[in-house]
């Protein structure tokens, strides 16, 4: 396959851009993501205080300049802060802000390399979203609906401002009703908008729900991501209510406190230990293929071609042809990862 591109990854294994907010966390992601089949990615932030998001941006600038070996950092995906607290999911409610174009301009101007500001998740129904979306459209920043209570009509209206897709489709958004299609219905209806699916495990989105989207949208309008966080790198405590586990920093270890009372400790710097904490990109691909009717060409589109086109990186990524970066992910006939180049 052309190298897998993860456009929604907060962290992986021994590095977490979201939790640690350091250049070293990104270097760790560059180093270890190839073990998961990923050759390039967008470091993804969360709904945090603005100054902390700006710290992330500066770290991304630094690592992009260094261009370390491993997976290439293509830029930043700003997941927030302009999201709806009603659908905050695991984001901080106090950091879910009303869209403000002045704040957006401040974030954008923090980037030394403006091309790194590639993607933003936003709740388009909130006051001020139109101005932020116009700004993003003018500066070639891809935008997606996410953590949103938007109605079908609100999304229909905001598409004029460049809305291109939906973040972790069906999760963290207003559901479908036959008289008000909601955010989820809009995701299925607008055939020119991308549906991003995060770590298609069957846990956050059932396999049947994914299959439904696949039948309606087709493989050319789906992007597979992981939304991995690098959970072992939590700086205090992170409650993963879907998996019913709390990740608690305990000196130089991380304690996994299961809701049923079971506890286990892992070393957050031990790659072999922490890689088991979250499903990798390569495992997600295999899992998706095991439970749906996707073919090899579909996988290529969802993992490489579509994400490259979506974030305007298809001049060098996403396909195998002369002049493109020679990023390759090699899997066997069972879709087990062999190696990457």
What are these regions (language model features)?
Residues 33, 78, 136, 166, ...:
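Conserved, mostly hydrophobic/aromatic
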Residues 23-25, 56-60, 178-184:
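Charged helix-capping and loop-helix junction motifs
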Residues 108-236:
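Active-site core of metal-dependent hydrolases
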Residues 1-55:
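Metal-associated gating/positioning segment near the N- to mid-region
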Residues 5, 167, 226-227, 326, ...:
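Active-site flanking residues adjacent to catalytic metal/cofactor-binding acidic residues
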Residues 11-24, 91-98, 142-146:
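Active-site mouth loops of central-metabolism enzymes
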Residues 84-109:
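Conserved phosphate-binding/catalytic loop of the ribokinase/pfkB sugar-kinase fold
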Residues 186-195, 215-226, 232-324, 328:
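His/Asp/Glu-enriched, well-ordered alpha-helical/loop segment
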């Amino acid at each position: 396959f052309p190298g897998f591109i993860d456009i929604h990854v907060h962290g992986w294994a021994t590095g977490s851009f979201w939790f640690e907010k350091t250049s070293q966390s990104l270097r760790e992601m560059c180093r270890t993501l190839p073990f998961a089949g990923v050759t390039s990615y967008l470091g993804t932030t969360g709904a945090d205080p603005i100054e902390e998001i700006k710290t992330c941006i500066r770290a991304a600038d630094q690592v992009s300049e260094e261009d370390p070996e491993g997976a290439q950092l293509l830029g930043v995906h700003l997941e927030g802060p302009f999201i709806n607290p009603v659908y905050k999911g695991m984001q901080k409610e106090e950091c879910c802000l009303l869209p403000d174009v002045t704040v957006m301009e401040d974030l954008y101007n923090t980037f030394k390399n403006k091309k790194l500001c590639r993607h933003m998740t936003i709740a388009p129904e909130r006051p001020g979203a139109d101005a932020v979306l116009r700004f993003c459209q003018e500066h070639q920043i891809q935008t997606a609906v996410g953590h949103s209570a938007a109605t079908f009509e609100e999304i229909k209206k905001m598409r004029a401002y460049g809305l291109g897709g939906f973040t972790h489709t069906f999760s963290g958004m207003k559901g479908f009703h036959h008289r008000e299609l909601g955010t989820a219905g809009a995701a299925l209806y607008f055939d020119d908008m991308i549906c991003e699916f995060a770590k298609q495990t069957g846990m956050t989105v059932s396999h049947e729900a994914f299959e439904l989207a696949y039948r309606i949208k087709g493989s050319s309008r789906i992007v597979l991501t992981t939304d991995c966080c690098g959970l072992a790198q939590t700086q205090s405590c992170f409650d993963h209510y879907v998996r019913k586990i709390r990740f608690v920093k305990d000196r130089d270890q991380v304690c996994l406190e299961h809701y049923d009372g079971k506890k286990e400790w892992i070393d957050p710097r031990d790659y072999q230990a922490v890689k088991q904490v979250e499903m990798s990109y390569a495992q997600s691909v295999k899992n998706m293929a095991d439970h749906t009717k996707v073919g090899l060409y579909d996988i290529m589109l969802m993992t490489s071609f579509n994400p490259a086109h979506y974030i305007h990186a298809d001049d060098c990524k996403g396909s195998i042809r002369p002049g493109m970066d020679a990023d390759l992910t090699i899997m066997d006939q069972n879709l087990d990862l062999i190696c990457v180049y």
